[in-house]
Amino acid sequence: MSYQLELSFSPVNELINSLHTFLCKSWHKRIDLGPAWTQNVHASLSPEFADQLEQTGIDLEWKLLHLLAYVSPNKNSVEDYLLWMRKLTLGELFAVLSPYVQTFPEDFGAVRDRQHRMLSEWNEVYFKHIDPGIVTALRAEAEEKTGWGEFEAYEKAAALTNGFCFEPVNGLEKLVLIPHYHFQPGNIFYSYGSLTICQYASRIEPHSEEEDEPSLHLYRLLRSLSEKSRLRILHFLRSEPRTFIEVVRHLGISKGITHDHIFNLRCAGLLNVHVVGETVSTYSLRVERIQQIEQGLFDYLGMNPSLLSIPVNEMVEPSNEC
């Protein structure tokens, strides 16, 4: 049993992702852009638009918006997509979405109109002003990774998403991976029956003026190992996948603190996250990421570990001095 894997990207995806990031308040302290990004964007909004976004939740309507962007034939530019979205009749709207979903909001036409106005204004006040290099880099990421032909769909998806293992369950026919920038280090995924769409963290980082600045990817990895409880989680998962509740019981601490520890390990790529539909079923140890820790640190230091080997008989005896 397997599924088809597709790599995709359009500017519309990042338009929606950037707004998703702004709306998802629980992630504002977790994103690589930091809380300052949210504050700066909020300061640029009109009071009316800020109030509208304050009342907008991440719900079924939002899930359908991600799907609509994927099925649209006019998504090479944000302007083309918004024009297509506005001109869709209600019948056409149902026609393009009904192969994947059977549940729709009441008064779907009004929902579409509201989403169109929201995306249009977000594009005007924020998205059209972002560094164009972000979109260019995301498009290049999708094109480059499409060429990873030597991997099976399951393994390729796990590698690109930093450990998300989309299990090949009955009914899943296609997994679409879309690189994103704003919501890093998180992934966003939705299941639509035979189709699953996952926006994954591209690991594209802002330019740093400091030559010795470690990558966020490396820093997150090393920092994730700074808590004893996180090391205990890795040890607990070393032999077989475990559910979240099993991890909580093993640690003997609260669900909230356990969730934070798992979040840090997951974003560092140290855990496999086994996904069934839209549910995380279990976690397991991502051994290949453990093996990359030493090499990642040596790469940052600009050192070749093969040139640093010291024969045992040449090692200095430890001193007894304090």
Regions found by a protein language model. Name each.
Residues 228-231, 237-243:
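Short capping segments at the starts of secondary-structure elements
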Residues 1-170, 174:
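N-terminal, charged low-complexity regulatory/assembly segments
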Residues 271-277:
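Beta-hairpin "wing" of winged helix-turn-helix
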Residues 281-312:
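Conserved segment of winged-helix/HTH DNA-binding domains
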